[in-house]
Amino acid sequence: MSSHHNDKATFLERLIFNNRPAVIVICLLVSIFLFWQATLIRPSTSFEKMIPLKHPFIEKMMEHRNDLANLGNTVRISVEAKDGDIFSKEYMETLRQINDEVFYISGVDRSGLKSLWSPSVRWTEVTEEGFAGGEVIPQSYNGSPQSLDQLRNNVLKSGQVGRLVANDFKSSIVDIPLLESYPDPQDQGKLLALDYRKFSHELEDKIRDKFEAQNPNVKIHIVGFAKKVGDLIDGLVMVVMFFGIAFVITLILLLWFTNCLRSTVAVLSTTLVAVIWQLGLMHFFGFGLDPYSMLVPFLIFAIGISHGVQKINGIALQSSEADNALTAARRTFRQLFLPGMIAILADAVGFITLLIIDIGVIRELAIGASIGVAVIVFTNLILLPVAISYVGISKRAIAKSKKDAHREHPFWRLLSKFASAKVAPVSILLALVAFGGGLWYSQNLKIGDLDQGAPELRPDSRYNKDNNFIISNYSTSSDVLVVMVKTKAEGCSRYEAMAPIDQLMWKMQNTEGVQSAISLVTVSKQMIKGMNEGNLKWETLSRNPDVLNNSIARADGLYNNNCSLAPVLVFLNDHKAETLDRAVHAVQDLSLIHISEPTRRRG
């Protein structure tokens, strides 16, 4: 190296290249440690991480979480009879076995488990002697034709058609509320967090696979947040496979671009080191892989390859004038380290801004991406030039790089004319027109999901097919808007509170995109009608406090312990942005009209 270049060498350059063996050894030791850490990282997420906890609606949900125990994280299993309907001995036996099997799966809130076999699912009717009722499946059920006829009558009188039983009577649902944490079977004093991947696999192995094989006339459909997240985590295997494909494609393209196997291997190796460091540091700092952060390694790989190619190209150009690979690597480091550092810092700032989004998985994605671009500084801006200073670049690659540097490509020559003095004003005008057009068209941009089901999964995925089945055959979907009507203690049964709830339900049931709505008013009207010999004229709210109090006695789960909160369950066709906007605006518009001191509506 000439004295001219020695004079330009910075302290950082001298520190790195005068201690190349130490740099290699340190990076090797760090890589071994972080590789071990990376092997320990596991898929991990939770219900709370997937939602914006500071959103006013979510804050109210968390505030009344104990009052809404069965309205949060739930899974629904629909058991379909392929031939015939549910009123057969074989089907009901399979449903009973599924109900029992689900009961013992870890993480299930067993007190809230509901199906036709649950004692809490009852029927009621009005007779000459008064009210009659009982369990939908009585203790005397034995699978005989007479028992099945009685079961059919009980289902029709239970009000569960469209809820637990499909509208066409060809399937029924097992409703499974989940616990975010549950006692360890081995140590009851210790709480275990719900493992979504394990839970999803148990549903597949113990429910779907087992009972579809046991009864060929049965088909299982499973929906719910936990199942969706489990399917997303299972996609990690596919992600790893695609990462391998991307690696091979990148290898081929780099070989074609550089004509040098040594430099190609160096770029790929240092970039893989960056990915390993990123995963290792994520585990070291206590993070896991969720359905979003599992995509960060792709991003780090792409950024690392981009910076690596710039380094290799620069070293190849310098190698045509330098005495050896070390000199070329030092000159390239001197020229490209600062621009590369600025580019990486810009990337990091962009990812850090995602931290303002108050959703756990998005924040972890931002942290993971920021860690990833930070390690690229060490692996691709420092380690790569040091590695190339040892292995060098082939003469073919140097000759090709020199030739490409002096060759004018027709396309780039044409493109450069847009920056000439004559054409530049036109270029600016076109850019302004494109900006204005984009700004105008962006007003039509939809916020939220545009399709039914889980947009994170393919439209033809098993989960989305199951979701479509339930939407098509039931009046209650997995997309539920819960409107919390809050009153003073023991006030939810007052006419002043129930009348606005009744109006809210009517408004929601006549809103596009709403399947149905249920509240304590639904039960109250049915009971008042029943107490008046089943006369439909009496299916309305009474102003008599004693009548209202008695009418909600069986409205289990539709008001809290001190009757200060009454949820209205609004079942939606889907969770598209338009559907949610219409439903929320309908609630808010009615709240502005009817809000009063004893009653408050909270989304």
Regions found by a protein language model. Give the residues of each.
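Helix-loop junctions and hydrophobic alpha-helical segments within the transmembrane domains
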Residues: 318-345
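Alpha-helical transmembrane segments of integral membrane proteins
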Residues: 27-34, 246-254, 270, 274, ...
